[in-house]
From Swiss-Prot:
GO molecular function: signal sequence binding
UniProt keyword annotations, A-Z: Cell inner membrane, Cell membrane, Chaperone, Cytoplasm, Membrane
Location within or outside the cell: Cell inner membrane; Cytoplasm
Name the UniProt record assigns to this protein: Tat proofreading chaperone DmsD
Length: 204
């Protein structure tokens, strides 16, 4: 049985998307990736048909008065309400809270699988970016079954809705394109999954 997450391009794409959603654009982790996506040529290396990526190449390079750092602050930090919060429990919990039941279920699954993953101080583990980074780490360490369980049980049940709202509310060409790239890539992965995606009610 071949897992799609065994492919080298899976972990690379998951790590790129995860870092860009999780880290500030000027950070050591994200800045080189921002530079790549705002240049020509990355689309030839991405595991999707180039024709579907052509509009994103232009969008990533589109100039905007709002800087990448300002957009990041507005979309991921605040101080105002985030237009599309990147934590799973905000979408999956009836009260739309951080550290909700879905976060606790993820923690329990991680404990059962012996997965330890460093998070920023006091941040929930179910951040969209950190889940992608965790998936990349699992794939790179030959843990394909756990990687695909993570996607099917703890990310895909809410990620489509999160990305739809993120793209709609991003209001910055780079982050709108990033949301679209993530939506296309995750849809491709979901179509290749060997286990069914958990069906969970969404509350946003």
């Amino acid at each position: 049985m071949t897992h799609f997450s065994q492919q080298d391009n899976f972990s690379v794409a998951a790590r790129v998307l995860g870092a860009l959603f999780y880290y500030a654009p000027e950070s050591a982790e994200a800045a080189p990736l921002v530079a790549v996506l705002t240049s020509d040529g990355w689309e030839t290396q991405w595991p999707l048909p180039e024709a579907s990526l052509a509009p994103l190449v232009t969008a990533f390079q589109t100039q905007c008065e709002e800087t990448h750092a300002q957009a990041w602050q507005r979309l991921f930090v605040g101080p105002w309400a985030l237009p599309s919060p990147p934590w799973g429990s905000v979408w999956l919990d009836r009260e739309s809270v951080l550290f909700g039941d879905s976060t606790l279920a993820l923690r329990q699954w991680m404990r059962e699988k012996g997965i330890q993953f460093e998070m920023k101080q006091n941040e929930p583990e179910d951040h969209f970016g950190s889940l992608l980074l965790m998936a990349a780490w699992l794939a790179e360490n030959g843990r394909q079954t756990e990687c695909e369980e993570l996607l099917a049980w703890h990310l895909f049940p809410w990620s489509t809705r999160f990305l739809d709202v993120f793209i709609e509310k991003a209001e910055h060409p780079f982050y709108r394109a990033l949301g679209e790239l993530a939506r296309l890539t995750l849809a491709q992965w979901q179509s290749q999954l060997l286990i069914p995606v958990a069906v969970k009610p969404l509350f946003r």
